[in-house]
Amino acid sequence: MSTDFTYTITIVDILPEAEGELLVNRVDLQVFRNGEGLESRLIGVKGEERPYALYRETAQKHAQVFVGRWYLDGVAKYEVVFLSLLALERRLSERPCLILHCAYLEYQGKAMLFSAPSGTGKTTQAGLWEQYRGSRTVNGDKALLEYDGKMWTANGWPVCGTSEVCENKKLPVGCIVMLSQA
């Protein structure tokens, strides 16, 4: 059995420097790429003074993750923080799948996905479908969409978001609804 990708996680007092050309520069994330196409990411949280981790790809199938010791007693208890460390969307881009920011509902044996920017009403819409149509929320924040050559399926994702609902369930995609505010 071969390994798809491996990580080495190290707790440090001082984060190493990121390497490569700066591609993305947000308050909570800086993404760099070196000449070999390998990424480094400084990962933070909005409102914090400094990043809490550095993700650095050292080969096509390996990354080092450095986590600041100061952060382990704080926000690091949340699963979303740990998943950010792994840059899973990089691994998924190598496969016929993608992560969709959405409320993922099960309705009549199929996945119904409500997607929109944060604060638009995905969770509210999911609650209304549960209340009036008998649907069930599988994940209130994300779904992993996968194409098998014939159809798209929605899969559970291990981050719950504010809904605190996340189940590992695979269903054929029935519809994707893009919400907007009036």
Please give the residue ranges for each predicted region.
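Hydrophobic positions on the alpha1 helix immediately C-terminal to the Walker A/P-loop
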Residues: Q125
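Conserved glycine(s) of the Walker
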Residues: T120-K122
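A noncatalytic interaction/capping subdomain that flanks phosphate/NTP-handling catalytic cores
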Residues: M1-L113, S118, L128-R136, A143-A182
